[in-house]
Amino acid sequence: MQYLILSLIFLIPSLGMLTGLSIAATVAFFLLSIIITGFISFIQKQEFNKKFFIKLYPRFGFDDIFCIINKIKTELLFTAWCFISCLFAVHPINSLVTFTKVFVLLFLRFVSNAVTFQNVLYIKNSLILGIITAILLFFIEYSSHGFLTRMFKTHFGLYMLDRGCALLSITTWVAIIILFSNGHNINSFILYIVVLYLLSISDSLASFLGFSIGGIIFILARLIKTIFFKLITISLITGSLLFPVIAKQIDPQNLSEKYLATQPSAAHRLFIWHFVANKIIIRPILGYGFASSKYIETGDNAMIDYRGEKLHPLPLHPHNNILQITLELGILGLALFLCLVYKYLKEIDNIKVSNFRAASYSCFINYYIIGMISYNIWQTWWILSGIWILVLMKLLVKPDIIIDN
């Protein structure tokens, strides 16, 4: 089973570069493998009989349960509101199905958190090798116009590597932490520059922006660490609260003509955000219900006429996590979501090792920015990408570094 896990750690970033949607299957299988490994180890170490349960019960009573609930009360409140919002969603059954799927994924993450591994060095090497392979695969596809992809598909577009680039951008921060912890500072810098260049020539603008800003965040977190937590928290929460207001006030047609004439995809996002902001005003407090974005009706008169093309004002999701949360869960859901953001930023700030704290901030911001520009917050592969990073942090950090997951 250990060899299987090592293989998956190598395959997830490398295979993910070529087929981004494979992340959903490989990471889910990875989590199940971890849980099974932990269960087998548990059985081997303990005598599985009545005496064991009698011995175990006094050590894990109601006080422990209340302690766990208290630690995750913010998550529970947000989850409860997501569930309640399913009941008044545009399509309640579909929303409940999506909610169940997301809940199961997060539960797998919660269970896998208790598992530890002995061969950490092999896991680190597998991850770094997987990242290097992903980088090589990108350049092969980029220079050969999709030689490998066209073996399985009829055509190739650089956009097909966007999900792989997004995964690479956040996974690289874990590798940077590993290299820093082993004293390979120059190697970590080289890795950052190589990935930054890769993302700059890719079609994934969101990943490039997230990774670039992540680098700036890393430097600031090291230079002004005494006030950095307050600075990043105020900036992130204030910006998130103001974003729906800004999206309402912008003139997407004018901005697109002036600044995004050569970026039709980015221009389309401005129209989407403006449309969503107007929809939020109709139901600002409660929203339209969990995962309801793709079911909100849009009439023919709402279609966007941009340079002779008809664009949909809300194709599947808002392409912005803050707008999606506000649209679906209302101001109440946004407030709970930002409470979670504050909690996770505080947990990162509690990390004592400077490089690890700075890289964790960078990874968090990287993930956050990509979500602010591109993907559906409830997409299976995107949720599992975040879980993948959390599991790697748990498995690969030094024993003296404590993370409250």
From Swiss-Prot:
Keywords: Membrane, Transmembrane, Transmembrane helix. Its main location: membrane. It is found in: Membrane. GO terms for cellular component: membrane. The chain crosses the membrane at residues 23-43, 77-97, 120-140, 156-178, 201-221, 227-247, 270-290, 322-342, 353-375, 377-397. Pfam families: Wzy_C (PF04932). It is a multi-pass membrane protein. The keyword Transmembrane helix applies. The keyword Transmembrane helix applies. It comes from the Bacteria. Belongs to the O-antigen ligase family. This is Putative polysaccharide ligase RP358. It comes from Rickettsia prowazekii (strain Madrid E).
